[in-house]
Amino acid sequence: MRRIASLALLMTAVSASAFAGDYDALISAIKKTWPDKHNVAVVCDQGGSKGNVQILASAASGMKIMLIDVKGPQDMGKALGTLTAQKPDVVVLVNGDRVAGDGSTAATFLIQRMANIKVPVAATTEAGVKQGAVVGVGPSTGGKLLVNPKAAMLSGVAVPEGGTAI
């Protein structure tokens, strides 16, 4: 039993370090492309995505992180109300989040509503960029910076240089 626990801890540490690099690259792209954007919002199931949120917060040093906890799709309306009132500079999707992660219907809802109020969304997956995130870099992108020019136009922001358009 002890070996299984050690193996699980090792796997968590390895996957956490992989995520750290992914969020580092994403935050770096955000800071480089939009240097005036310092307030980052994250909408996720806080309990289920706690590790990823901590890693993201570490990567986003010097930026203010606003965490909006959602337990299910029924909470997305309240989350949108908070986002509309607080109007963050950018929203980052948490890959793998069971409620609002890349590829989910809640993420699509969030991306569309954020574009309406000119707030760009960033992701770590190709799925997130295809859904309408302006920028994405992470494991599913092979480390390549992916951009969505249409989403950038709708959100009123510049397209990151050197990205591959989707």
PLM region spans:
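Short hydrophobic alpha-helices and adjacent helix-cap/hinge residues
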Residues: 16-166
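Sec-dependent N-terminal signal peptides
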Residues: 4-14
